C-alpha cells in the first residue's frame, strides 16, 4: 500500500496542529509510523486519503457499534439538521434519549447530558464531592477517565501509550486528592480506605477496563467494591463511557449484576457525534444545578444532532438478538486470532468481554496495569504495521481495545483471521 497523501497531510498538520493530531494516540507514535488520514467510512470499512480500504476495528474508538454511516442514523440526523443544529435551549429529543438511558441502566434514575466523556466523569466527581462533602477520590492504575486534572494520575489510554501516566500541568495540590489502587485488587482498595477513613468521596473505575487493553473484572471484584462503598458511605461510580451499551444494552452493570451509585456514559449514546452523560440515584442528581448547588453547564449539552443520532442508535440496539449476534461474531474473531497466534508459535494472551477484545503480546495473564505494561510493545508495533498492510485497521497502541460492529461480515472476520495468521508468522 502507498500512503503518500497521508504523509503529505501529516506534514501539513504538524505545522499548525500540536503533534499533527487532535488526540495524541492518533499520531501512530507508539508504532513508529505516520498516521493515516481518513477520507470516508461505510459499514465495516474505512478509506484513507490514498484510497486504501481497511476493515475497521477501531470504530471511532467505540461509538460505531452499528458500523459507519448507518443509513437510519444518517437520515435522521439530516432531517434534524433541517430544523437547526443547536438552540441552547431544551428540546424534546433530550427527554427521549434521557428516558431511554434511564430505562436501560439499572443505576440511573436521573441523567444529565454533556458533550464528552471527559465532561461526564469530571462532573460526576464534582457532584460526588458536593454530595458527600469529601475531597478525595479513588481510581485505579491504568483506568482512563478523560483528561480532567484530577483523573490524569496513573491513567491508561493515550497517557499509557506515551509512558506519561502523570501529565505535566496537573498541580500537586490537585493530584494529592487522587488515590490510586490496583485494578482487580480489593486489598489495595481496603488499605487506602483505612488510611483515608472518612475522606473519600467516590471510587471511580471502568467496570471493564478498556484503556489498558481489555481487562475484565475478576469474580468478586465489583461486588467487593459495592460492599465497601456501601459500608463506608463512598459513592461508587462506574465509568461506562466505553462499556455502556457495548458489552450489554444495560452496560457492564447489567452484565455483572452490580449497581453503582452513579454512571458515566458517552460514545455509543451519541451514535458517532460528540456526547457524554452522567446519571445516578435521584437523591444525588438533585444536588446538581439548577435544582441543587453543585454547578455544571455546557453550551452544546443535549445538542439535537447528537440526541437524534443516539436515539436512532439505541432503537436498533433494542432489536431482539442484536447482542447475541454481536457476541457470536466477536467470539469467532477473538478465538480465530488466538488460534492463529498459537499455530505460529507466538505467545499471546487474549481477552474479551462482549464486543470489546484485545490481544496482549505476552504469554502471561493480564489482570491489571502492571501485567498489561509488561507486554512486548515492540512486537505489537510490528504486528500492527503488518496488519495495516493487509488491510486491517487496529488501534495504534497495545493499550487500547478493539471493537466489533454489527456491520462486520463473515467475510470480514475470515479475512482478518487470515491476515493475522500471515502476520504472526512474519513477526515471529
Curated annotation (Swiss-Prot):
Cellular compartment(s): Cytoplasm
Molecular function as annotated in GO: glutamate-1-semialdehyde 2,1-aminomutase activity; pyridoxal phosphate binding; transaminase activity
Main localization of the protein described in the UniProt heading: cytoplasm
InterPro entries: 4pyrrol_synth_GluAld_NH2Trfase (IPR004639), Aminotrans_3 (IPR005814), Aminotrans_3_PPA_site (IPR049704), PyrdxlP-dep_Trfase (IPR015424), PyrdxlP-dep_Trfase_major (IPR015421), PyrdxlP-dep_Trfase_small (IPR015422)
Enzyme class, first EC level, given as a word: isomerase
Reaction(s) this enzyme catalyzes, per UniProt: (S)-4-amino-5-oxopentanoate = 5-aminolevulinate
EC number: 5.4.3.8
UniProtKB keywords: Cytoplasm, Isomerase, Porphyrin biosynthesis, Pyridoxal phosphate
GO biological process: protoporphyrinogen IX biosynthetic process
Reported cofactor(s): pyridoxal 5'-phosphate
GO cellular component, one term: cytoplasm
PROSITE patterns: AA_TRANSFER_CLASS_3
Modified residues (N6-(pyridoxal phosphate)lysine): 267
PANTHER family assigned to the protein according to its UniProt record, in alphabetical order: GLUTAMATE-1-SEMIALDEHYDE 2,1-AMINOMUTASE, GLUTAMATE-1-SEMIALDEHYDE 2,1-AMINOMUTASE 1, CHLOROPLASTIC-RELATED
Name this polypeptide is given: Glutamate-1-semialdehyde 2,1-aminomutase
Organism: Trichlorobacter lovleyi (strain ATCC BAA-1151 / DSM 17278 / SZ)
Amino acid at each position: 500500500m502507498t500512503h503518500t497523501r497521508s504523509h503529505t497531510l501529516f506534514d501539513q498538520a504538524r505545522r499548525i496542529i500540536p503533534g499533527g493530531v487532535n488526540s495524541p494516540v492518533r499520531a501512530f507514535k507508539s508504532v513508529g509510523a505516520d498516521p493515516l488520514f481518513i477520507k470516508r467510512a461505510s459499514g465495516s470499512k474505512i478509506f484513507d486519503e490514498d484510497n486504501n480500504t481497511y476493515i475497521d476495528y477501531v470504530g471511532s474508538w467505540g461509538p460505531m457499534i452499528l458500523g459507519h454511516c448507518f443509513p437510519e442514523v444518517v437520515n435522521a440526523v439530516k432531517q434534524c439538521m433541517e430544523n437547526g443544529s443547536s438552540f441552547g435551549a431544551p428540546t424534546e429529543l433530550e427527554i427521549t434519549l434521557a428516558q431511554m438511558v434511564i430505562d436501560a441502566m439499572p443505576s440511573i434514575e436521573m441523567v444529565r447530558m454533556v458533550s464528552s466523556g471527559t465532561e461526564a466523569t469530571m462532573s460526576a466527581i464534582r457532584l460526588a464531592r458536593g454530595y458527600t462533602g469529601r475531597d478525595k477520590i479513588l481510581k485505579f492504575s491504568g483506568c482512563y477517565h478523560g483528561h480532567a486534572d484530577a483523573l490524569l494520575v496513573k491513567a491508561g489510554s493515550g497517557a499509557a501509550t506515551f509512558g506519561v501516566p502523570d501529565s505535566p500541568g496537573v498541580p500537586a495540590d490537585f493530584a494529592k486528592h487522587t488515590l490510586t489502587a490496583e485494578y482487580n485488587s480489593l486489598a489495595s482498595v481496603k488499605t487506602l480506605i483505612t488510611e483515608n477513613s472518612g475522606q473519600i468521596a467516590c471510587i471511580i473505575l471502568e467496570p471493564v477496563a478498556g484503556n489498558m487493553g481489555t481487562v475484565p473484572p475478576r469474580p468478586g471484584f465489583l461486588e467487593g467494591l459495592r460492599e465497601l462503598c456501601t459500608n463506608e458511605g463512598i459513592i461508587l461510580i462506574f465509568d461506562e463511557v466505553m462499556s455502556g451499551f457495548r458489552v450489554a444494552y444495560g452496560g457492564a452493570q447489567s452484565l455483572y449484576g452490580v449497581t453503582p451509585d452513579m454512571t458515566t456514559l458517552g460514545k455509543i449514546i451519541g451514535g458517532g457525534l460528540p456526547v457524554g452523560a452522567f446519571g445516578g440515584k435521584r437523591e444525588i442528581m438533585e444536588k446538581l444545578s439548577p435544582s441543587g448547588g453543585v454547578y455544571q453547564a455546557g453550551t452544546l449539552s443535549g445538542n439535537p444532532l447528537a440526541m437524534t443520532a443516539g436515539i436512532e442508535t439505541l432503537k436498533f440496539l433494542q432489536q431482539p438478538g442484536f447482542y447475541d449476534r454481536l457476541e457470536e461474531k466477536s467470539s469467532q474473531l477473538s478465538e480465530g486470532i488466538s488460534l492463529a497466534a498459537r499455530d505460529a508459535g507466538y505467545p499471546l494472551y487474549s481477552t474479551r468481554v462482549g464486543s470489546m477484545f484485545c490481544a496482549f503480546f505476552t504469554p502471561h495473564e493480564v489482570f491489571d496495569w502492571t501485567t498489561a505494561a509488561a507486554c512486548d510493545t515492540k512486537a505489537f508495533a510490528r504486528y500492527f504495521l503488518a496488519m495495516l498492510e493487509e488491510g486491517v485497521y487496529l488501534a495504534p497502541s497495545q493499550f487500547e481495545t478493539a471493537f466489533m460492529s454489527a456491520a462486520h461480515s463473515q467475510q470480514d472476520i475470515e479475512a482478518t483471521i487470515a491476515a493475522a495468521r500471515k502476520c504472526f508468522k512474519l513477526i515471529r
